[in-house]
């Protein structure tokens, strides 16, 4: 099969890296050849695949060596569970410089050093954050990734972030080949969560590709720095990640999204009871004023 490159975005703390690594482990278990490129200065995109605290990053090693050209591919690329290739781009010290530059530097280095080998089926870019800013848009801006998946939940801020990411991707979709493949709902057990995310997906013209239920086995596996696929392959949660993997393999619904306006998003949240129906008569009034 032709190489498929996928960027995974989502609100900070939504479980994006955990979801990505469990998805990748399921793909590897099914015989797919996969590489993960962590695009986050926290460098936590590969720890469950490698059973490590944090993989050494391209930017750290480049700083130690003098410059990125002084590195070899084997310095930055490690092999983890199921033969998954793992790389962390890293970034500068907090408060110094643009972390997005680390993503650009790392991807260019990997290309030049032949990391994107012919036997690869998938590359997943696990990308920082709530917004598609310049540096972190690198995987989609430069047409590296053709597919975007957004991890979200039924919480209001996760939905705002998902809509903003869809909005940020539209520009690059029109100028290149990147398309939105769907929303992955990583459940927080909010009311009517699956219905809400399906409604949000429909609103922006995509699909909820899978609903991942909440299960404590994920945390039990993480404590051991393992994916659920490896830690407890017979768990129901492992089957959920396998189902997500199959759906992504088979996915043909790749779209240019039509992001919701703030008013449309708030109407959706009010419809599902996430946000109270706005009463203009009380706007700006303190509690003591009623």
Swiss-Prot record:
Binding site for [4Fe-4S] cluster: 98, 133
Top-level taxon: Bacteria
Keyword annotations from UniProtKB, A to Z: 4Fe-4S, ADP-ribosylation, ATP-binding, Iron, Iron-sulfur, Metal-binding, Nitrogen fixation, Nucleotide-binding, Oxidoreductase
Modified residues (ADP-ribosylarginine): 101
Enzyme Commission number(s): 1.18.6.1
Catalytic activity annotation: N2 + 8 reduced [2Fe-2S]-[ferredoxin] + 16 ATP + 16 H2O = H2 + 8 oxidized [2Fe-2S]-[ferredoxin] + 2 NH4(+) + 16 ADP + 16 phosphate + 6 H(+)
Entry-linked NCBIfam families: nifH (TIGR01287)
Protein name from the UniProt record: Nitrogenase iron protein 2
Taxonomic source organism: Azotobacter vinelandii
